[in-house]
């Protein structure tokens, strides 16, 4: 799947789940589960509850996503 097929959203981490999975509350009110991208995992970027993050999701499954950036 190419990067053009992904939709980006911003949200806040509301809950930490096992295996580096997080529950994200999006700005539009929806809740999705997301995992950390490989580049963030490689660079040891830590994500805590309450952090603002940018996630990308496919148009095919709007319940799961990938965290691609942690806001400062």
Curated annotation (Swiss-Prot):
Location in the cell: Cytoplasm
S1-like domain boundaries: 1-72
Gene Ontology CC: one annotated term: cytosol
Entry-linked PROSITE patterns: S1_IF1_TYPE
GO MF entry, a single one: translation initiation factor activity
Keyword set, alphabetical order: Cytoplasm, Initiation factor, Protein biosynthesis, RNA-binding, rRNA-binding
Stored InterPro entries: NA-bd_OB-fold, RNA-binding_domain_S1_IF1, S1_domain, TIF_IF1
Predominant localisation class: cytoplasm
SMART domains per record: S1 (SM00316)
CDD domains: S1_IF1 (cd04451)
Family: Belongs to the IF-1 family.
Biological role stated in the UniProt entry: One of the essential components for the initiation of protein synthesis. Stabilizes the binding of IF-2 and IF-3 on the 30S subunit to which N-formylmethionyl-tRNA(fMet) subsequently binds. Helps modulate mRNA selection, yielding the 30S pre-initiation complex (PIC). Upon addition of the 50S ribosomal subunit IF-1, IF-2 and IF-3 are released leaving the mature 70S translation initiation complex.
Assembly and oligomerization: Component of the 30S ribosomal translation pre-initiation complex which assembles on the 30S ribosome in the order IF-2 and IF-3, IF-1 and N-formylmethionyl-tRNA(fMet); mRNA recruitment can occur at any time during PIC assembly.
Name of the protein described by the UniProt record: Translation initiation factor IF-1
